Structure formats: C-alpha cells, structure tokens
Design a protein with these regions (language model features):
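WD40-repeat beta-propeller superdomains and closely related acidic/aromatic-rich repeat-like regions
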Residues: 1-126
Length: 126
C-alpha cells in the first residue's frame, strides 16, 4: 500500500513503460516510481501548479511527459525524471473544467476538451 499523497486520489495514469504512476487529487499531483523495488518506502514527486482540483492526467506515449488538467480550466505539461520528480515545462488555460486530455501518438501534440464541449490542441516543444 502507498501513502503520502495529500488528498484522495481522483485520477490515475501510468506512463507507457509502467515505471511511473501519477495520482491526482486536490491541486497536487503525486508521482510514484516503480523502478527497482517499487514505490514503498520511497518519497514520491509532488507537482504543484493548479489552483483547483486536478480533473485529468495523461502521459505522453513516448518519454516522461505528463499532461494535467484541472477544474478551473488550467492545463500543465510536466517533465519528469525516472524517480517521479520534475517540474512544469508549460501551462495553458481553457475557459472551463478540463474533462479530457489526449496525446497524439508522436507525443508532439496534446488535445484537451472542456465541460462546454470545446476542444483545443497545442504543439508541445520537444
């Protein structure tokens, strides 16, 4: 069992290698490393930039980039290390609650949808 996240996890996402697990709850994202013997006894990475509950998490198909969306419409792209620690490499804003996020297969574009039915795409610098 893992513990240490600040609030009840509301969303979960593994990266494509299965070595990182991101959990979203409240405004903070917690990232656990499954390298070596797994996350028990390790200190997870904590990512903070949202001012509202995190509503969506999605890892890029390639590499260790994570996209997150929140109820206030904020979106962040995170660059992560293999231990789950990292930082924001870009942010954007939608007009309403982020309800979905998806990466293009080449990991260079993300699309996000919101509660008003709008869909927006962004190119992600590599």
């Amino acid at each position: 069992m893992m513990s240490g996240y600040p609030g009840k996890p509301r969303n979960l996402a593994f990266n494509s290698s299965g070595k990182l697990l991101a959990t979203g709850g409240y405004e903070i994202i917690t990232v656990w490393s499954f390298e070596n013997n797994g996350p028990e006894g390790t200190t997870p990475g904590q990512l903070e930039c949202h001012e509202s509950f995190v509503s969506m998490l999605s890892f890029a198909p390639h590499g260790n980039r994570l996209a997150s969306g929140a109820r206030d419409g904020s979106i962040a792209i995170w660059g992560l290390m293999s231990d789950g620690h990292g930082g924001s490499i870009g942010t954007s804003q939608m007009s309403d609650h982020v309800s979905s996020i998806a990466w293009k297969k080449d990991s260079k574009v993300i699309a996000a949808g919101n509660a008003k039915g709008q869909i927006v795409t962004w190119k992600v610098k590599t």
